[in-house]
């Protein structure tokens, strides 16, 4: 039909990560995507200096910021570091267990771990919670309190993973006809 059923689309531009080096280059990139119509920026990683500059410049321009903290970059900027630097929201949950570490900076993965294997990556990512502070512990409480004080938003993504576990039920969901893109409907 060509109709948009949602109230509106809020376009976010994807930050190119380590291709942008330095404070001024990051700010210049944010200004450029704002000029092209982006209302926000999504990040997957980059240098600490560039990430902080993106958060700051986006805020100055009234843009939103969201980050999928790539697992191979959270050792130097985890979700709490990003929240303190001005990030608005954390996508999925990557970077949160690392913010809850008390005895390490880098995640412990088995020596044979293959980051390129998505199912293995998801399994190991889930095990990161076993390396984090115990729920309810002092460190856990401090991290959660600080994130709340910073008005930091956590945006978990569970629906499609549930569909992977129960495709038959998800295939017949009543909202598909109205909301699922035709290309994605082929998955179901």
Functional labels for PLM-detected ranges:
Residues 29-41, 96-188:
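Active-site neighborhoods of metal-dependent hydrolases
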Residues 19-32, 73-81:
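Short, acidic/polar
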Residues 14-17, 46, 70-74, 93-96, ...:
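Active-site beta-loop-alpha junctions enriched in small/polar residues
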Residues 26, 51, 140:
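Aromatic/hydrophobic pocket-lining residues that form the small-molecule binding cavity
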Residues 37, 60-64, 84-90, 150-151:
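Glycine-enriched alpha-helix->loop->beta-strand junction motifs that scaffold or abut catalytic
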Residues 9-13, 41-43, 65-67, 90-92, ...:
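Hydrophobic faces of well-ordered beta-strands that scaffold small-molecule active sites
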Residues 2-7, 11-12, 52-70:
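Alpha-helix-loop-beta-strand connector modules within alpha/beta enzyme cores
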Residues 32-33, 54, 58, 82-83, ...:
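Generic structural signal for hydrophobic
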């Amino acid at each position: 039909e060509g109709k948009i059923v949602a109230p509106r689309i809020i376009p976010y531009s994807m930050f190119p990560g380590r291709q942008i080096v330095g404070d001024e280059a990051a700010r210049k990139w944010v200004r450029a995507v704002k000029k092209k119509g982006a209302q926000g920026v999504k990040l997957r990683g980059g240098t600490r200096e560039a990430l902080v500059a993106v958060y700051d410049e986006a805020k100055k321009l009234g843009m939103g910021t969201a980050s999928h903290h790539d697992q191979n970059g959270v050792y130097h900027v985890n979700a709490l570091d990003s929240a303190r630097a001005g990030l608005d929201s954390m996508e999925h949950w990557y970077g949160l267990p690392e913010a809850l570490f008390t005895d390490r900076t880098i995640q412990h993965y088995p020596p044979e771990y293959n980051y390129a294997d998505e199912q293995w990556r998801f399994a190991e990512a889930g095990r990161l919670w076993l390396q984090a502070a115990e729920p309810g512990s002092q460190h856990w409480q401090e991290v959660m309190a600080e994130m709340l004080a910073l008005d930091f938003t956590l945006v978990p993504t569970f629906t499609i993973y549930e569909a992977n576990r129960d495709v038959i039920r998800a295939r017949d969901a009543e909202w598909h006809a109205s909301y699922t893109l035709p290309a994605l409907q082929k998955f179901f």
